[in-house]
């Protein structure tokens, strides 16, 4: 962790040489360290919900700050045998405001409890299917041996970690319960900046059920280095308050449809607030389905090294695509006829203007999927049909 300086501690350290080939990583343009001024990116789970006497090094990797310890929680009371719950009809409401969105969503939001040697950690989760599958964050459950899920009706169930993916910070749990209310799945592709957003989670391990906050979609396609060597791509930024402990919760549109999984917040000592981040649901669902099917994620691999390409216009530089600096052999890109010095400008019609936008697109694709790349080669336009490889 870097020196505190005048604005408090930061997360970003000097970048190390990338030795991992699971991703098409950009070639660094300069040795400058990657940081965002006075901001610290905080993955919301353990940063504020560890109720013990210390914080592990793994937690520091996610938060970049030490948290003030609070007394450990009391152990849960002994289990009681309860009569079967009576079923109640689903809430029927119209779309249009945060109250209605909350009524639709709250039955599908859970608290995730992760005991540790340091106390009780926690986060949030979203019911994905009626037969017990729940989506949460990788950093919520990583290293967990025993995980419990608390539902909005008060039911507390043991959960199994089906699988977890650090590249997208998505994990899937399963409980032995067959009567769940799954969240309605929306699409992050159609989100527009300025439209309403509602965040639902379980902040600070507070009792009493999920918490609802309200704001707007502030930005698309944010890239955050949340710890050294771990970068999240394509994030949705929102000003709907997301407090620690809400990691793995829901970001909803105005029709109570799930458009993101809340994952990180930015905090600062200089007064600016309101930066929360969510994994787009179009990316999260593909990862979750892979985890449910096999426990592993079939991340797509193009097989190149590259960097953002710039063009001069009216005395200014503008990003125009990804310059291919190296092609692996064998690789999906080589098999499609790709060459060094190609400039990739689109993937299935979606503009590619920086390396980050290419990586964001690849995160949402699966190995074996066929895509079309628009490429500029020696001032000519070429379309490449690529079958994506696997990592």
Q: PLM ranges: what are they?
A:
Residues 1-40:
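Terminal targeting segments of Actinobacterial cell-envelope proteins
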Residues 289-296, 334-339, 345-351, 357-391:
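PDZ-domain C-terminal substructure recognizer with occasional recognition of PDZ-binding tails
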Residues 3-8, 37-312, 326-329, 355, ...:
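Serine-dependent protease modules
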Residues 188, 250, 314-318, 331-343, ...:
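A short glycine-leucine-enriched loop at secondary-structure breakpoints
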Residues 319-323:
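Charged active-site motifs of nucleotide-sugar-dependent glycosyltransferases
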């Amino acid at each position: 962790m870097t020196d505190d300086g005048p604005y408090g501690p930061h997360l970003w350290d000097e970048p190390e040489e990338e030795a991992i080939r699971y991703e098409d990583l950009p070639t660094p343009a300069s040795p400058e360290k990657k940081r965002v001024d006075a901001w610290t990116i905080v993955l919301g789970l353990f940063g504020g919900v560890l109720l013990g006497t210390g914080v592990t090094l793994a937690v520091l990797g996610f938060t970049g700050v030490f948290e003030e310890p609070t007394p450990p929680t009391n152990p849960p009371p002994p289990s009681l045998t309860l009569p079967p719950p009576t079923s109640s009809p689903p809430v029927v409401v119209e779309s249009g405001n945060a109250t209605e969105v909350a009524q639709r969503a709250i039955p599908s939001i859970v608290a995730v409890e992760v005991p540790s040697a340091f106390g009780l950690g926690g986060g949030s989760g979203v019911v994905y299917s009626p037969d017990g599958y729940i989506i949460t964050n990788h950093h919520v459950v990583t290293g967990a041996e025993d995980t419990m899920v608390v539902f909005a009706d008060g039911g507390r169930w043991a959960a199994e970690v089906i699988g977890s993916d650090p590249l997208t910070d998505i994990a899937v749990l399963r409980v032995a319960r067959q009567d769940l209310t799954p969240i309605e799945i929306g699409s992050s592709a159609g989100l527009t900046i300025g439209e309403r957003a509602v965040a639902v989670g379980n902040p600070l391990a507070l009792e009493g059920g999920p918490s609802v906050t309200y704001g707007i979609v502030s930005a698309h396609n944010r890239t955050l280095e949340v710890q050294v060597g771990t970068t999240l791509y394509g994030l949705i930024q929102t000003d709907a308050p997301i407090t620690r402990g809400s990691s793995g919760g829901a970001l909803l549109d105005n029709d109570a449809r799930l458009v993101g999984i809340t994952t990180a917040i930015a905090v600062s000592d200089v007064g600016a607030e309101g930066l929360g981040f969510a994994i787009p649901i179009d990316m999260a669902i593909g990862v979750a389905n892979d985890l449910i099917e096999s426990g592993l994620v079939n991340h797509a691999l193009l097989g190149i090294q590259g960097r953002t390409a710039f063009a001069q216009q009216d005395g200014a530089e503008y990003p125009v695509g990804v310059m291919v600096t190296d092609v692996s052999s064998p690789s999906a890109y080589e098999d499609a006829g790709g060459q060094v010095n190609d400039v990739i400008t689109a993937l299935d019609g979606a503009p590619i203007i920086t390396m980050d936008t290419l990586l964001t697109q690849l995160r949402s694709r699966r190995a074996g999927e066929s895509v079309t790349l628009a490429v500029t080669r020696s001032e000519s336009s070429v379309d490449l049909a690529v079958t994506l490889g696997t990592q």
